[in-house]
Amino acid sequence: MKIKLYIPTCDKYNWLIQPFAYTFNKFWSEDIEVVYLGYTNPNFELPNNFKFVSLGKNDSLENWSTDLRNYFNSINDEWLMMTVDDSMLTSRTDSKLYDLALDYLQKTDRKIGRFGLERDLVTREHQHWDTHKGFNLVEAKNEATHRISMRWSIWIREYLVKHFVQGMTPWTFEEDGTINSKGDGWGIISYSKTNPPKPPDNSVVFNTNALWRNWFRDYGRFNIMDCAHEDPFKKIDDETIDEMKKLNYFPQGIEFGSIYNKKWYKVRV
């Protein structure tokens, strides 16, 4: 099974496509098709495995879920990946774990809505779900927060579309979706190293960073630290940062740094 990665975005963050694409192809593969779902087409060339689809006019944020629901209802993919536009790869992808996830989804007869691929689900309440080829799988408990999440995940399209209710923003998609997902009969799962699991204990497919945002304000900051890794102090290597700077992938005046205990620390790179 081969699936595509979909990334919702907006005009304000079109500039993130270039550093995202660079780290994606460096730390994973140029054979995976990536589809950006945005509004105004970017004014730069995309790598061969990247595609930009315009959803129309970049207007009210409340149209976010409606635009995505309409798009995903128009395609035939049974399974797909999705993530946010400001969470890029920071080190090599565990391709073996990724392939095993696809293998499990093809072979199991259990209902799975979302398969988390990074250090996310396992940091909250979870329990044993299954074992597949030597790897433990855990599911989010009903009381867990962020059962519905925009973090790197594989989704069955039917379940994803169900949660794109009209008038939702990315934040209410996660908040309301989590409430609506409780007891709905769909598994929300991820990898685990130990059984019974003790957080944080998972094996992750992707190690990622996240741009520093505070509610609806953008501080023009780029987090170089890995926020979804077993080692929270691991950062994107200097060589990769230097390569992207030479290619002018960052806007003038962008600040580089790290986040610790919800505080921003500027660093020189």
Model-predicted regions and their roles:
Residues 18-21, 62-69, 94-103, 170-178:
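Well-ordered, non-membrane alpha-helical segments in soluble/globular domains
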